[in-house]
Amino acid sequence: MKSIRLLCLLAVLILLNACGFHLQSKAELPPEMQRTRLEIQSPYSQFARRLETHLEQSGVNVVTALDGAAILEVPVNATRKEIQSIGDNARVREFRIRHTVQFRLLASDGTEMIPLQTFEQSRVYSFDEQDILAAEREDEFLRNDLADNLARMVVRRLGTYGK
């Protein structure tokens, strides 16, 4: 019985390895980013908090002073809600949430390391006017998920500098 379990476990591990699966590790960011100042529109947004967390998890010391620090500029950090579809009774059935982020990385001397980049993600969710509280919770969950995904994308992109 133990040998069957062991064989099954081994088969699963081989299949996962064969398909290219690997655990996500922290991004290796350029050494110039050891100290980084974050200049972001909406500094108290969910995206800003998630970006700072992911940067710190990757070994970046996020600072407020400019002396000797790289600058990560995020001039655009915008979320908008759009009507996706309308039902037969002329009422909204689905919404789309779009989150757009633009960023660029400057060295401590002001030279551009990564030019302005734009990332955008969106999610669609159904709206039920009979259950407005659930729709609000889903809206909030999707906004947080988009913010986290975009923050991860930005950090991964920063990790490609010089490669």
Language model: regions and residue ranges:
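C-terminal/domain-edge helix-coil "capping" segments
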Residues: 133-163
